[in-house]
Design a protein with these regions (language model features):
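Small-residue-rich transmembrane alpha-helices that serve as helix-helix interface/gating elements
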Residues: 88-93, 152-167
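Membrane-water interface of transmembrane alpha-helices
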Residues: 30-42, 93-109, 173
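C-terminal transmembrane-bundle signature of multipass membrane proteins
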Residues: 159-186
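Juxtamembrane helix-loop boundaries in multi-pass membrane proteins
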Residues: 15-17, 21-25, 48-70, 113-131, ...
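Hydrophobic alpha-helical transmembrane segments in multi-pass integral membrane proteins
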Residues: 68-75, 128-146
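Membrane-proximal helix-loop-helix units in multi-pass membrane proteins
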Residues: 74-131
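Membrane-interface helix-loop junction between the first two transmembrane segments
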Residues: 35-55
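Short, strongly hydrophobic alpha-helical membrane anchors
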Residues: 1-18
Length: 187
């Protein structure tokens, strides 16, 4: 490490300070809304498979938001090593959590042929495993090369991806695309 390298690394993460603060706040707010949405939506559905699907989707959205929240909060303490370590830990936690959620959804038949949203369920599971694996690999690479601004930027973009993934799952949990207002009847 050259004499000015530590300052460059600190400056790079400093460029994202506002992003990390906003990310922590946004993920906490969306987590609260997600809990309310799941409570409301699951209360009116008697189908166990649909409830399990929603629970798995909400759980995976929850994992993504918790990942973004903790990585962002810890990143505010500064340093590429801290940022890399928080990404590493959260990626491992989320991979284990995703494995558990997928197992439950599989037992409930959410990946069975003929299940109405089978392809979407498989896509969400694949995106989760892939995204957290990418986060894990980038975190390991950053810990090996803490001066790499490209790796730091890539991990910041992973956080953006986590938000997108969580919002897509939360949208699907609510069932908004499938719920339509009744057609008006002419009187």
């Amino acid at each position: 490490m050259q004499p000015g390298d530590a300052r460059k690394v600190a400056l790079l993460l400093g460029h994202y300070e506002m992003f990390f603060a906003a990310s922590a706040g946004a993920s906490a707010a969306i987590l609260g809304l997600l809990v309310v949405a799941v409570s409301v939506v699951n209360s009116d559905d008697a189908d166990a498979k649909t409830r399990e699907r929603r629970t798995a989707l909400a759980g995976s959205a929850f994992l993504a938001l918790v990942d973004a929240f903790f990585v962002s909060i810890v990143a505010l303490t500064g340093g590429a090593t801290v940022f890399g370590t928080s990404n590493l830990v959260m990626a491992m936690v989320c991979l284990l959590g995703t494995r558990s959620l997928v197992s439950g959804a599989k037992r409930a038949g959410n990946f069975s042929r003929g299940f109405p949203t089978r392809r979407l369920n498989i896509a969400f599971a694949t995106i989760s495993f892939g995204g957290y694996s990418i986060q894990l690999g980038l975190a390991i690479a950053l810990l090996a090369d803490a001066q790499s601004s490209a790796l730091q930027r890539a991990l910041v973009l992973v956080l953006v991806g986590l938000f997108g993934s969580a919002l897509a799952r939360a949208w699907e949990v609510t069932g908004i695309p499938r719920r339509r207002l009744p057609e008006p009847t002419d009187r």
